[in-house]
From Swiss-Prot:
Molecular function per GO: iron ion binding; N(6)-L-threonylcarbamoyladenine synthase activity
Parts of the chain that traverse the membrane: none
Organism: Pyrobaculum calidifontis (strain DSM 21063 / JCM 11548 / VA1)
Name the record gives this protein: tRNA N6-adenosine threonylcarbamoyltransferase
Top-level taxon of origin: Archaea
Name of the encoding gene: kae1
GO biological process: tRNA threonylcarbamoyladenosine modification
Chief location of this protein within or outside the cell: cytoplasm
Family: Belongs to the KAE1 / TsaD family.
Described purpose of this protein according to its UniProt entry: Required for the formation of a threonylcarbamoyl group on adenosine at position 37 (t(6)A37) in tRNAs that read codons beginning with adenine. Is probably involved in the transfer of the threonylcarbamoyl moiety of threonylcarbamoyl-AMP (TC-AMP) to the N6 group of A37.
Gene Ontology cellular component list: cytoplasm; EKC/KEOPS complex
EC number(s) from the headed UniProt entry: 2.3.1.234
Amino acid sequence: MWFYSVPEVIIGVESTAHTFSLGLVSGGRVLGQVGKTYVPPAGRGIHPREAAEHHAKAAPQLFRKLIEEFNVSLGDVEAVAYSAGPGLGPALRVGAVFARALAIKLGVPLVPVHHGVAHVEIARYATGSCDPLVLLISGGHTVVAGFSDGRYRVFGETLDVAIGNAIDMFAREVGLGFPGVPAVEKCAEAAEELVAFPMPIVGQDLSYAGLTTYALQLVKRGIPLPVVCRSLVETAYYMLAEVTERALAFTKKRELVVAGGVARSRRLREILYEVGREHGAEVKFVPDEYAGDNGAMIALTGYYAYRRGIAVEPGESFVRQRWRLDTVDVPWFYDLCNR
């Protein structure tokens, strides 16, 4: 167990997928972040080994940039937080090794952070939310959750691929590029009609893999690409709205916070604002600069965890490629309600 006063500076390391990013938090305030993103060759998805090689090259450059840009005194750093999972194994390991080496050099503890929890916490921090229903949507997550009994409890989730990944896969196959969500939405603007899509919702859970397959079949049948794009995103977003609406009705929450990279979607915002109005819930979206993977969210969540005594010796660092959101203790949850 590490003992301390209030931590002064926390450095956060994010490396779960295509982005390597370092973030900085001081006294619970986000100071900023730096990052680089691996962009796969056209027509290909993320290759874990190539992403890891990208991260390994980017790490020392970004560390120097962080120190210089924010005038960090390394003597003030109290802990190093890192994204321990879930994510791509090779990419996670690069971040963990870098964080461990930095912690050893500085003589400070490590704070392992759950990537999904970090998305939620940066959204709560940035929107000033206390006890919201959370919709976490990104390339790796599609979860509707709320806090109960010390953890985020899942009220609905994808049964296969995440919404961002599903749309990215479609975009890649039809040549729209990466990242796929904004590219597909841009293409959809040229369409004035929709075609019917299946809406696979099982109870409170969703299935997105079939939407990608169905959309590709429509393209092969000669349906105009903008029409398929518009139909795909409308269906995918209304599926989210359906399970979110049910969760709001069940939990009676009066705040809905939307986190993750797909939260940038303007069309999705229109749909979810309407859901909020119908249920008397205020809908808040994470700011765009914190929507995608970033080191600031790791540093911030690491700060909260460290204040609650959550830390490990550098030699005890670990990564978990699979790690459910609802298995993580969140003892700091109500600290944000007393700011």
